[in-house]
Amino acid sequence: MAVANSSPVNPVVFFDVSIGGQEVGRMKIELFADVVPKTAENFRQFCTGEFRKDGVPIGYKGSTFHRVIKDFMIQGGDFVNGDGTGVASIYRGPFADENFKLRHSAPGLLSMANSGPSTNGCQFFITCSKCDWLDGKHVVFGKIIDGLLVMRKIEFQAPLGKRVQAWTHSLTCPALTGILALILMPTE
């Protein structure tokens, strides 16, 4: 399946984004709970802070976008180590690839970052273009439904092939679930 059709039962999360201290907008993301419920729920709970470890909420608040590659993807969600090596999930460790029904067929798709089969955790990426070579390797579990231009603003912070580091900070989330703000700084 190329891209799942929107469903009114699917949760929507959002990222409020700022670059260099300037607010650039909001990305609303529908999570495909109707196709990949386990994967969508893992992400949703890390967005809302519902998941707790030793009574303390853990999730994307304060995490980084550690990879931004123009014409490919923006990757983040490693709130464990902040560098792309951390793994955590609401299931207490890496979890299996739920299914590969959805394809990396367009920009704006949310997919699990992993280090091989069935190593899903907290890390995710958003496609900046069609990435069909990732099909069957990474689980697509959401799509930007509003704010694709904001994703492009993040993407264009990275010179070709270079990484951009981004710190995320919590903002209030009035009606939807989930929050992130980005402050991008080039790294070498």
From Swiss-Prot:
Primary localisation category: nucleus
One GO location term (cellular component): spliceosomal complex
Reactions it catalyzes: [protein]-peptidylproline (omega=180) = [protein]-peptidylproline (omega=0)
Keyword line: Acetylation, Chaperone, Cytoplasm, Isomerase, mRNA processing, mRNA splicing, Nucleus, Rotamase, Spliceosome
Keyword Disulfide bond set for record: no
Regulation: Inhibited by cyclosporin A.
InterPro entries tied to this protein: Cyclophilin-like_dom_sf, Cyclophilin-type_PPIase_CS, Cyclophilin-type_PPIase_dom
Pfam families: Pro_isomerase
Subcellular location(s) per record: Nucleus speckle; Cytoplasm
Enzyme class per UniProt: isomerase
The enzyme's E.C. designation: 5.2.1.8
UniProt record similarity statement: Belongs to the cyclophilin-type PPIase family. PPIase H subfamily.
Subunit structure, interactors included: Interacts directly with PRPF4. Part of a heteromeric complex containing PPIH, PRPF3 and PRPF4 that is stable in the absence of RNA. Component of the U4/U6-U5 tri-snRNP complex composed of the U4, U6 and U5 snRNAs and at least PRPF3, PRPF4, PRPF6, PRPF8, PRPF31, SNRNP200, TXNL4A, SNRNP40, DDX23, CD2BP2, PPIH, SNU13, EFTUD2, SART1 and USP39. Heterodimer with PRPF18. Heterodimer with PRPF18.
Protein name as it appears in the record: Peptidyl-prolyl cis-trans isomerase H
UniProt organism field: Mus musculus
Gene that this polypeptide is encoded by: Ppih
